[in-house]
């Protein structure tokens, strides 16, 4: 399964580090070139309630290529129309964009890519970006939990795929 975290800032970098550490193939995508360069050259450094460094693969949006089975969307919601339209060609035929954003952005995203490609997820932990490539996990590692929901068009297989991917993070 090919996965991307689009908007890999503080939360996305922590999530991507855990997922990569546990064997997932995930691209961390961020428009901040300094952050992307630091991630690629030094790895994702996570401090705070943990202390780890994980080699990760990071890209800027213009470096994206190919198709993804799952794109975890972690940008600000006000950017969704532009970002989701940009991401649509990068989804496989049964690919899913999973929102990890404040609010209820899924109906607007479904208008662009369809309910069969839209899932929602709430994150119950916090992080902060300290400097390019370095994030602080502000929650206890054993509290890294998610609450998922799906639109009517999402299959049980798609839901299970995302559930297993997120369970693999820690």
What are these regions (language model features)?
Residues 28, 72, 99:
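Conserved SAM-binding loop
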């Amino acid at each position: 399964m090919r996965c991307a975290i689009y908007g890999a800032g503080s939360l996305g970098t922590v999530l991507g580090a855990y997922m990569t550490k546990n064997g997932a193939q995930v691209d961390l995508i961020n428009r901040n070139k300094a952050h992307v360069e630091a991630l690629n050259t030094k790895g994702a450094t996570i401090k705070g309630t943990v202390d780890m460094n994980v080699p990760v693969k990071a890209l800027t949006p213009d470096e994206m290529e190919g198709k993804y089975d799952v794109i975890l969307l972690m940008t600000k919601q006000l950017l969704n129309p532009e970002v989701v339209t940009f991401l649509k060609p990068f989804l496989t035929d049964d690919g899913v964009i999973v929102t990890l954003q404040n609010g209820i952005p899924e109906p607007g995203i479904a208008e662009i890519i369809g309910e069969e490609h839209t899932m929602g997820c709430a994150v119950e932990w916090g992080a902060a970006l300290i400097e390019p490539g370095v994030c602080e996990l502000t929650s206890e590692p054993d509290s890294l939990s998610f609450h998922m929901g799906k639109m009517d068009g999402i299959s049980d297989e798609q839901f299970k795929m995302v559930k297993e991917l997120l369970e693999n993070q820690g």
